[in-house]
Amino acid sequence: MFLPTDAATQYYPYFEFYGQALKSGESFLWNPHLFSGFPSYLSQSAGFLDPVNIALFSALDSFFAYHTRLALDLFLVMFFSYLAARALGLSRLAGMTVGPAYILAFNWGYLSNPVIVNSMFLMPLLVWGAAKIGEGSHRWRFASIAGAGVGWSMLSGYAQITVYAAVLFGLYMVADQLLLRREYAWRAFLKTAATLLLTGAIGVVVALPQVLPAL
């Protein structure tokens, strides 16, 4: 986006190494330019194992691929914010303002930080998913979509944002059952628990390339 310190001194060099490794067919699992060598992909390096990043940085110049990914992330924020707003009953016009408001609520310096921006889509995605699940239709489909979003954020984004968004998703599901739908039967609790377990399981499976090496 712009040129703050984090991008200029950390992420541009990270992704220049990453892009060059992909284009030359060499391994990006060991970065010889950090210390005496360091497995950058294990840190919060914004998704060296993310298939979207692999495709972008294999095909494009590293600088252009970096900013293309940021633009894609911000588009997804706008898209899922609109869907979430509509699912919550807002008008089309009001829904179109939610994404920009959400983005502007962040420190603008973060908008060039891929670790942060790669996870910004998750909150509106999970709000949309929870709202659609609460409607009672296609519960398992939207739980699966939510799980895929959690996994993608774990794979390429900021762990703190991912955890916060996932916790909010769980609280929303429980509050929707108890306070809005007022369902207190044990079957309702089992259904909510199964929904959350499915979401979590899919998230872990999607994120396995990042999770397993870090264990």
Language-model segments: which ranges?
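Membrane-embedded helix bundles of polyisoprenyl
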Residues: 76-88, 92-179, 192-214
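Membrane-interface coil-to-helix junctions
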Residues: 1-79, 100-121
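Aromatic-residue-lined binding/catalytic grooves and analogous aromatic/hydrophobic interfacial grooves
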Residues: 188
